């Protein structure tokens, strides 16, 4: 192969459309190679088309309602030009995923429970987005209030799992099963809150959270399909809805998902992983989300640890989360997103092979 092919613009500076094609191809290949019956292909395609089509109606409406994003002044300066881009895009693609997942799965108890948890987390995100738009600031709900609401949702979901006698065993690499007993509930609450915050932190570059979310959902769906076909349908509908959203969110984005979408993504992923007993697969698939979270935690700890008499500390990264560090290191947004898509697809393949 001619090495000069990699000097082509599609590799050096991909466009948002290039990334949409890449994402579509990755999702299609995952279904074809790892899902023997291809039963997930139809719900994937259907929700993609419906989500993309609905967005054509909702995005202009959000613009007319002046639902423009308020940008962080302490964020990358290049992002200030995005101020005014409609937000709360999660309000159209998340309901598409939930409605079609419920119908396609025939309202099984597991899917109903996960859908309700997802709706609750979407509601928390909506409140946060609405506060930001209402007061024209980027503060939204206080971190304490948001955490309290997330924990409340997690506790209610754990109570449902307890009543319905969901297994407290977790399966690790090599099909090693570990019974956690009471400690499972502590882990479950943590996973629900941590995963939703991790996807929220990942939502900082056009097409990043939605695309990596689509790959993660489809990968988790493929893993659990043999044991939980109803939840596999849920995951596939979410993957398709995310892909349809990327049609509008690809660089340059016409709409952002906001916390309305990002909190729902993480909550849904965590809930499915917990019910299906595949936390190891969830951990691998969510590797990039956790990297984003850990980069923020490490940045804060390092800054406080190196704080001098003047009250100022040193920064481990140029900016957290990690994708902002890459931006300030000279990476274009599209290059970051393309790299994250490919790495996430590899993590999904690893999770499938090890499950």
UniProtKB/Swiss-Prot annotation:
Record's GO cellular component, any one? Answer: plasma membrane
Q: Which UniProt keywords apply?
A: Cell cycle, Cell division, Cell inner membrane, Cell membrane, Cell shape, Cell wall biogenesis/degradation, Magnesium, Membrane, Metal-binding, Peptidoglycan synthesis, Transferase, Transmembrane, Transmembrane helix
From the UniProt record, list the reaction(s) this protein catalyses.
UDP-N-acetyl-alpha-D-muramoyl-L-alanyl-gamma-D-glutamyl-meso-2,6-diaminopimeloyl-D-alanyl-D-alanine + di-trans,octa-cis-undecaprenyl phosphate = di-trans,octa-cis-undecaprenyl diphospho-N-acetyl-alpha-D-muramoyl-L-alanyl-D-glutamyl-meso-2,6-diaminopimeloyl-D-alanyl-D-alanine + UMP
* Topology within the bilayer: Multi-pass membrane protein
Tell me any Pfam family this protein matches. Answer: MraY_sig1
An example GO biological process term is: cell division
**TM segment ranges:** 14-34, 40-60, 84-104, 107-127, 147-167, 176-196, 205-225, 227-247, 268-290, 334-354
Q: Where in the cell is it found?
A: Cell inner membrane
Q: Which cofactor does it need?
A: Mg(2+)
Question: What family is this protein classified in?
Answer: Belongs to the glycosyltransferase 4 family. MraY subfamily.
What functional role does this protein have?
Answer: Catalyzes the initial step of the lipid cycle reactions in the biosynthesis of the cell wall peptidoglycan: transfers peptidoglycan precursor phospho-MurNAc-pentapeptide from UDP-MurNAc-pentapeptide onto the lipid carrier undecaprenyl phosphate, yielding undecaprenyl-pyrophosphoryl-MurNAc-pentapeptide, known as lipid I.
- Would you tell me the protein name for this molecule? Phospho-N-acetylmuramoyl-pentapeptide-transferase
Organism this protein belongs to: Microcystis aeruginosa (strain NIES-843 / IAM M-2473)
Q: Name the lineage.
A: Bacteria, Bacillati, Cyanobacteriota, Cyanophyceae, Oscillatoriophycideae
**Gene coding for it:** mraY
């Amino acid at each position: 192969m001619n090495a000069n092919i990699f000097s082509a613009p599609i590799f050096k500076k991909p466009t948002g459309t290039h990334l949409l094609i890449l994402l579509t191809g990755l999702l299609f290949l995952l279904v074809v190679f790892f899902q023997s019956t291809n039963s997930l292909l139809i719900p994937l395609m259907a929700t993609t088309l419906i989500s993309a089509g609905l967005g054509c109606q909702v995005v202009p409406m959000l613009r007319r309602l002046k639902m423009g994003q308020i940008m962080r002044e302490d964020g990358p300066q290049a992002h200030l030009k995005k101020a005014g881009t409609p937000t709360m895009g999660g309000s159209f693609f998340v309901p598409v995923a939930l409605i079609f997942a419920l119908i396609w799965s025939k309202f099984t108890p597991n899917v109903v429970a996960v859908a309700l948890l997802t709706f609750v987390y979407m509601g928390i995100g909506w409140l946060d987005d609405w506060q930001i738009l209402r007061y024209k600031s980027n503060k939204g709900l206080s971190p304490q209030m948001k955490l309290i609401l997330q924990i409340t949702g997690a506790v209610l979901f754990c109570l449902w799992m307890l009543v319905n006698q969901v297994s407290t065993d977790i399966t690790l690499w090599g099909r090693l099963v570990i019974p956690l007993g009471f400690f499972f509930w502590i882990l479950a609450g943590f996973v629900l809150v941590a995963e939703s915050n991790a996807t929220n932190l990942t939502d900082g570059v056009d097409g990043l959270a939605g695309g990596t979310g689509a790959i993660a959902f489809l990968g988790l769906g493929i893993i659990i399909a043999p044991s939980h076909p109803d939840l596999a349908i849920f995951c596939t509908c979410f993957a398709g809805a995310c892909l349809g959203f990327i049609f509008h969110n690809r660089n340059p984005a016409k709409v952002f998902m906001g916390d309305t979408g990002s909190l729902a993504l993480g909550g849904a992923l965590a809930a499915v992983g917990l019910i299906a007993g595949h936390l190891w697969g969830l951990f691998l698939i969510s590797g990039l989300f956790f990297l984003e979270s850990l980069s923020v935690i490490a940045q804060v700890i390092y800054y406080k640890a190196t704080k001098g008499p003047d009250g100022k500390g040193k920064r481990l990264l140029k900016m957290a989360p990690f994708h902002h560090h890459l931006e300030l290191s000279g990476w274009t947004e599209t290059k970051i997103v393309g790299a994250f898509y490919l790495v996430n697809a590899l993590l999904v393949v690893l999770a499938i092979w090890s499950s």
